[in-house]
Amino acid sequence: DCPSDWSSYEGHCYRVFKPPKDWADAERFCSQQAKGGHLVSIERFGREDFVSNLITKNLQRG
């Protein structure tokens, strides 16, 4: 189960954070948000679509 402000996909939890960070700062930040947390890695087309939609929704919210 994911926290209420996170999204679930294939047994993993995802969340878009703002403002943008460089890779090293973003990876460090993600590891502090949840045990085992990391920046998303796009390894399959389904995940790519999911992450793309998640980012688009968050950008539209402002």
UniProtKB/Swiss-Prot annotation:
Compartments reported by the entry: Secreted
Molecular function per GO: toxin activity
Residue span(s) of domain C-type lectin: 9-62
Highest taxon listed in the record's lineage: Eukaryota
InterPro entries the UniProt entry points to: C-type_lectin-like, C-type_lectin-like/link_sf, C-type_lectin/snaclec_domain, CTDL_fold
Disulfide feature: 2-13
Gene Ontology annotations for the cellular component aspect, listed alphabetically: extracellular region
Tissue expression as described in the entry: Expressed by the venom gland.
Keywords: Disulfide bond, Hemostasis impairing toxin, Platelet aggregation activating toxin, Secreted, Toxin
The protein, known as: Snaclec aspercetin subunit beta
Main subcellular location: secreted
UniProt key word Secreted: yes
Organism, as annotated: Bothrops asper
Record's function text: Snaclec that binds to von Willebrand factor (VWF) and induces its interaction with GPIbalpha (GP1BA) (via the vWF A1 domain), resulting in platelet aggregation. Intramuscular and intravenous injections in mice induce a dose-dependent drop in platelet count (thrombocytopenia). Pretreatment by intravenous injection by this protein in mice potentiates the hemorrhagic lesion in the skin provoked by the metalloproteinase BaP1 intradermally injected. This result is not observed when both BaP1 and this protein are injected simultaneously.
PANTHER family assigned: MANNOSE, PHOSPHOLIPASE, LECTIN RECEPTOR RELATED
Assembly information from the UniProt record: Heterodimer; disulfide-linked.
Homology family: Belongs to the snaclec family.
Entries under SUPFAM superfamilies matching the protein: C-type lectin-like
